Amino acid sequence: MTKTARYFTVLLTVVLVITVSIWGPEALAKYKDKGILNKPHIEVVMEAGEGYRYQMNANEKLYILARCIGSQVLSESEQNALTFYAGNAGLDYEDLEGSYAFVRKYNGPSGKEITDEQIYTTCNEGLRVLKELNILPQNVNDVNAASYNATLYSAIDVLEPRNNVVVWKMELSNSQKNADKENRLIDAYIDADDGKIYEFYARTSLFWGDIDTDAIIEAWADYMGLGTPSAYESDNPLLETTPYFKKYVFPGMGEGRTIVTVGYYEGINEIFLKIS
């Protein structure tokens, strides 16, 4: 091959490389676009807010729920008593503020959560278990859709949204205010996954002297899978809405802890177990 021929061969190769480098990517992109454009495609995406749900243990779930509802939502009996004691003690109560939210779940149950149709049966099953454990007396009546309202809530750690607990709140309907409340559940918080009862207020025929708080908290802790609690002395007994109570403390999340109170309202014969 002559020197001139080799020169033209090299020049042709260079031109070819430059042409491919410029035209090649554009041609490849057009080829790929043909398989995408003007054709319907289906892509499965997660709904907003429907992310990975972190599996918390029983103590962590109790702690998150307690932080969310501790001072935001009070039972009818506690609201009345709190108003009375606050007025007499000259105390000013404000709603709990911070990085925890307790919000109604308007989109309803998801996944394996207990449904609207199942919650009344689930609550009655929970009451049956509490009676068997002697946490509640046998004469507490079952709930039903005609007399009770069931509302689904999410208790959320705003800074760590994966830390959330979904619960049903079961409460005696406002239309039942003038009804006989003896031996009836007033309200309760029920886990939307396993149906366990976190907190309850119930009218009974018991008196404070009939109630063994240590036995109740031991049985309830075992039922919830919480481990053994420690006794807790209230920093300020005046903040309580009844003189009849005993407090216990459970490990929470991180350095946090959950206070569980077993108490009693004299006059209306109402026993309660609340978390805070």
Locations of the language-model features?
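Long, terminal "pre-/pro-" and other extracytoplasmic accessory regions
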Residues: 1-276
